[in-house]
Amino acid sequence: MKKLAAIFIITIAVQSHAQYPKVDIPGSEIRKITSSSVSGQEYELQILLPAGYAVSAKKYPVVYLMDSQWDFPLVKSIYGQQYFDGFIPELIVVGVTWGGVNPNPDSLRARDYTPTTESRLPQSGGADKFLSFMKTELFPFIESRYKADSKNRILMGCSLGGLLTLYTLFTHTDMFNGYVAASPAFGWDKEIIYQYEKNFYEKKSMLPARVYMTIGGVERSVPGFEKLVKFLADRNYSTVHIKSKVLENTGHSGTKSETYNRGLQYVFERPMLKMPDAVLNKYTGSYEGANGTKIELKNENNQLVIYFNPNYKYVLYAASESWFYSTNEFFNMHFTTDNGKVDGFGLDRYLNTQSFKKTN
């Protein structure tokens, strides 16, 4: 009788637990697409849209994230932090994973993310088919259904996903303009990545790109990574800019968080131009917003500073002669002119856009 009572209690507890709602990720949605390039494989797309997307007419950069079955929540969190702090723009995240019945990510990523076949993984070698899926099926799917900027795509992945990222950089140069590779599996097939880079280098037809890659400091492959980094640095590409880092006291999987944080900062990095006083002084003075907010702009030591009150200020950096920004929050300013004279600016802050007119 006691055993029956215990079973009854456990059953009730399980049923009660099963009634709780699942945690979801606000601002995200799931779409599915079946590929003809990868033999009828169904892919699940985990898509994150920026706040304000529904009422905006602008197009957004798109980050394509590999292995989103593991990393979509992480990247969603990173995006929110980096956007709020003003290091990256509003963007769309498209996480790609596998759909269908009981997909095995370990086997499928070995198939889709590797450029050649290794005997230990007979399913490997499908990277070109997967990239064909992305180029001819996934991009059109996203860009016809979402406000996606086709000229601003970023590829991001770890391990084999990082291998795919570097392989794409060297062999499918027109697909992306930003690449973030966490602990890439550069040793694949006797370091065949060097052969792809050789062909890439000899073509001398490189499109502009920014690349960020890392490795964990406790990984055994650190010497090989450092060799690759030096090799690429010695190439001295004119349009491909590469930044790398060995992450202290970090293992293989642990590279993702810092890599995706710093990688997104790097690929979206804006210039900090030095403007002459003659330019900055055009912008100094008093301004008033449509809601009555009053601010002052001052030139302090060849740096434009905006004051909302004496104790509330932002240092501004010049991305161009008329565009300025701050990095302690999402804060972008674009100055406007009337008959050659500065008459105001548009201020784009986190979830808020406002116009200001110059009053003196």
Positions of PLM-derived features:
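Bacterial Sec-dependent N-terminal signal peptides
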Residues: 1-21
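A domain-start/cap signature at the N-terminus of enzymes
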Residues: 18-61
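Peripheral terminal and inter-domain segments
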Residues: 49, 269-360
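Gly/Ser-rich "nucleophile elbow"/oxyanion-hole loop immediately N-terminal to the catalytic nucleophile
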Residues: 54, 108-159
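Active-site machinery of serine-nucleophile hydrolases
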Residues: 69-132
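Primarily recognizes the serine-hydrolase "nucleophile elbow" in alpha/beta-hydrolase
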Residues: 150-197
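Short beta-strand/loop motif that positions the catalytic acidic residue
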Residues: 212-215
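C-terminal catalytic histidine-bearing segment of alpha/beta-hydrolase fold enzymes
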Residues: 218-222, 226-277
